[in-house]
């Protein structure tokens, strides 16, 4: 029977694409037939591999843990330990991975080199999750260990590069430029890899590390304000290793520096150059997008140029995820330039072309803004706007802030076409939706609170115009009680009502 399960698992893995989950199920059946502890541990490792390859990292953790606990002392413990750490990190169990490393180090159950490799994974995961200080702390603790090192020189260089990189991210620049320079010099003077030398770097590894260290060195100089030295290093990187990802990312570093000092012209030019040099790279659309953002920051007179950049992105990279956002930005700029008709076309194309897009509600609301601006006092045009905004509020999962904004604009369109009672109903329902539900009121962001305040002040005005001062006062007092924007206006209106009464 065990041979049957082996064959079934093998067949599942040989399929195209591989059926990792099915293979794991067959291996579980095989494991349950096992009597030997070592066989049990090995099959658990294989099951963990299947789940890992299926990106089910939580289950991979369980089976790797079981394999490690039953296979203590095997020559594959170090490899299995690293797989477990990698699965924990990918499953978001960073604290658990850190504790496992500390326990294994204290008990001496892993080699020094394996501990360093595990710390590499954990430190990068900590940084990605926003725990930069903790990542830096763990790496520095590792590097300060004075015990005799059995770590390969190549791994030591990688960890020291990581420490320097994290230091830059943490803005801890003291002595950093010198550390990076020494690291680069050490790498350059390392002898070439010889057969059987475990700690040597392959030419490919050495090249990759050198480009990353050069990029880091240029970044450090730029961050310190030494733009000439920084650009010198980045230029060297581009000249000598122009085809590498580090050379490409050097343009991002340069643009960020220009943006930081307010030189948006140079920042825009740098991002545009990146897109021109590497048009097939996945970063090219991002470069055009950022170039347009920098162009916007130059001032309103450059909005037409930014529109062209967003259009270039959308035209050249129609399948890129940034396409939708580039078109949204293009429409927003056209609105800022009072080209509401052009903006409306952009939004309508997005709505029709991407009916299920998660950001559709933004295009819908923006289109309604354009139609509202173009309608003026046209009765039919305002009616169309009201219908669109009413439908918008029926969209599932519409963020609360947008609910508040859409309701206020719907009521505004109704008021402009003379439908006061309907507008009052819309405003009242909007106020009740948020004020009547404490959780929703607290969940509103700054924009949502602004639109809710406008709705309530508008509702109060309608009540005043209808001589319903008691209801108007009640609405204004709710604005005051919830400390909404326009609170002082509400206080003034309450005082005026008291005088009239």
Question: What label would you give each PLM region?
Answer:
Residues 1-501:
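Acidic, polar-rich low-complexity tracts and alpha-helical solenoid repeat scaffolds
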């Amino acid at each position: 029977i065990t041979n049957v399960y082996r064959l079934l698992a093998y067949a599942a893995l040989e399929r195209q694409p591989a059926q990792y989950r099915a293979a794991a199920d067959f291996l579980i059946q095989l494991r349950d037939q096992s009597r030997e502890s070592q066989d049990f541990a090995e099959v658990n490792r294989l099951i963990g591999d299947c789940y890992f390859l299926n990106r089910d990292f939580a289950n991979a953790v369980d089976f790797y843990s079981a394999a490690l606990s039953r296979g203590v002392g095997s020559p594959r413990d170090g490899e299995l330990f690293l797989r477990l750490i990698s699965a924990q990190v990918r499953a978001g169990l960073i604290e658990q991975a850190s504790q496992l490393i500390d326990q294994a180090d204290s008990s001496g159950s892993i080699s020094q080199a394996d501990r360093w490799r595990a710390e590499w994974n954990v430190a990068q995961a900590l940084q990605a999750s926003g725990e930069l200080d903790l990542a830096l702390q763990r790496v520095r603790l590792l590097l300060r260990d004075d015990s005799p090192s059995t770590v390969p020189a190549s791994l030591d260089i990688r960890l020291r590069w990581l420490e320097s990189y994290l230091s830059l991210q943490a803005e801890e620049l003291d002595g950093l430029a010198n550390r990076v320079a020494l690291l680069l010099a050490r790498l350059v003077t390392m002898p070439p890899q010889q057969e059987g030398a475990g700690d040597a770097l392959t030419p490919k590894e050495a090249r990759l590390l050198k480009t990353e260290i050069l990029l880091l060195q240029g970044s450090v100089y730029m961050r310190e304000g030494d733009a000439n030295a920084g650009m010198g290093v980045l230029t060297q990187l581009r000249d000598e290793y122009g085809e590498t990802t580090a050379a490409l990312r050097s343009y991002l570093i340069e643009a960020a520096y220009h943006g930081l000092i307010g030189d948006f012209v140079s920042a825009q030019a740098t991002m545009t150059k990146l897109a021109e040099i590497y048009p097939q790279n996945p970063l090219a659309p991002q470069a055009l997008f950022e170039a347009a953002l920098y162009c916007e920051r130059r001032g309103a007179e450059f909005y037409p140029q930014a529109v062209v950049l967003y259009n270039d992105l959308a035209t050249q990279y129609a399948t890129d995820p940034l396409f939708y956002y580039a078109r949204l930005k293009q429409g927003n700029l056209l609105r800022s330039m009072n080209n509401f008709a052009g903006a409306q076309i952009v939004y309508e194309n997005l709505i029709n072309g991407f009916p299920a897009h998660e950001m559709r509600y933004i295009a819908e609301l923006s289109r309604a803004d354009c139609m509202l601006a173009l309608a003026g006092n046209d009765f039919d045009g305002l009616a169309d706007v009201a219908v669109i905004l009413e439908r918008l509020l029926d969209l599932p999962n519409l963020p609360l802030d947008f609910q508040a904004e859409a309701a206020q604009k719907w009521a505004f369109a109704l008021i402009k076409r003379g439908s006061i009672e309907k507008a009052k109903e819309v405003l009242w329902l909007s106020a009740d939706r948020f004020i009547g539900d404490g959780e929703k009121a607290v969940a509103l962001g700054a924009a949502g609170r602004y639109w809710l305040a406008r709705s309530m002040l508008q509702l109060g005005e309608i009540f005043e115009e209808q001589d319903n001062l008691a209801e108007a006062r009640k609405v204004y007092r709710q604005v005051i009680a919830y400390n909404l924007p326009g609170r002082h206006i509400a206080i003034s209106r309450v005082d005026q009502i008291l005088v009239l009464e």
